[in-house]
Amino acid sequence: MSTLLLNLDFGEPPPKKALEGNAKHRKFVKKRRLLERKGFLNKKKQPPSKVPKLHSEPSQKGETPRVDGTWKATPLPKKKTTAASSSGSEQSLDKKAAVPWLTPAPSQKAGSVVAKVDLLGEFQSALPKIKSHPTRPQKKGSQKNPPPKNGPQNSTHTHSENKYSGVSQKIPGKMVAIDCEMVGTGPKGHVSSLARCSIVNYDGDVLYDEYILPPCHIVDYRTRWSGIRKQHMVNATPFKIARNQILKILAGKIVVGHAIHNDFKALQYIHPKSLTRDTSHIPLLNRKADCPENATMSLKSLTKKLLNRDIQAGKSGHSSVEDAQATMELYKLVEVEWEQHLAQNPPKD
């Protein structure tokens, strides 16, 4: 009778490996399972972890090894049910300590699956998108206009200040000075008719200077004051043509003049008051000249006192170019203060 030998190993079992993954990964897996249970995230099929084979015998197709060494036939994988069952088995295995020698070995076909999967991208893509709620429309009258960033906030003349401050900022290209010389027409030459017109820009450069032939017969040339003589009318521009040329220059600009209403009357033209600056009615100039504010000072006297310059001298008469340039220089002396005054007290057209 043969002897039966038993080989028993009473040593300690092999130590268990540490839980797979770090704490951050376990936290992510926990959140992912929670989303899977709530239906926000579809369960993902992953390849089972690798374990050492218990037997050297090759496994046949469709069979998996058991712990006791026997082989068990496994059903063919299905599209959805196997994915759910495999993910369920993975969840149960992950909850327990990972014992590599108890998990089934993967097949060779499963080894071709990519091991690293960007779970974070799938996790974010599966989350429901948050819809932005539209803001409620405010009722009419409830909206408040915000105060301007660069401007006075506590002014009762905001509209007018914006109007005049915008005009004054464009003065170099939008401001001109005009002066006209007249001759006498009509009965006894008592009607003043335009015979010369000069326009200068903000810097005093001449924009227009022409002799103009009145539509009526000239009775008095008024040479002592106007400087106009008969020979000046030989090649003079007809009044209608000259008037159209002048009005094109004045259109949309601030027009400065001394007793400018006489010039507009000779042109048969009315310029907007908001764009008109008359140096004969600016009290600031009189104050600088130490004259009564309500007094009407002549252009000659203001130029002498404030600019220390003599104009309209001699017997040759006035020069409309010289007068227009002097008028512009006088206005520049009080330009800032007078524009602020007009912003607070805008004239009515």
From Swiss-Prot:
Keyword presence, Nuclease: yes
Stretch list, region Disordered: 1-100, 126-166
GO biological process, one term: RNA processing
Composition bias type Low complexity, residue spans: 70-87
Exonuclease domain mapped to chain residues: 175-331
GO cellular component, one term: nucleus
InterPro entries: Exonuclease_RNaseT/DNA_pol3, ISG20_DEDDh, REXO1/3/4-like, RNaseH-like_sf, RNaseH_sf
Domain of life: Eukaryota
Membrane-spanning intervals of the chain: none
Compositionally biased tracts (Basic residues): 24-47, 130-142
The UniProt record lists the keyword Transmembrane helix: no
One Pfam family this sequence matches: RNase_T
Main location group: nucleus
Gene Ontology terms, MF aspect: 3'-5'-RNA exonuclease activity; exonuclease activity; nucleic acid binding
Key words of the record: Exonuclease, Hydrolase, Nuclease, Nucleus, Ribosome biogenesis
Location relative to the cell: Nucleus, Nucleolus
EC number: 3.1.-.-
Biased composition (Basic and acidic residues): 14-23, 54-66
PANTHER family named among the record's database cross-references: INTERFERON-STIMULATED 20 KDA EXONUCLEASE-LIKE 2, RNA EXONUCLEASE REXO1 / RECO3 FAMILY MEMBER-RELATED
Record function comment: 3'-> 5'-exoribonuclease involved in ribosome biogenesis in the processing of the 12S pre-rRNA. Displays a strong specificity for a 3'-end containing a free hydroxyl group.
Protein's UniProt name: Interferon-stimulated 20 kDa exonuclease-like 2
Organism ancestry: Eukaryota, Metazoa, Chordata, Craniata, Vertebrata
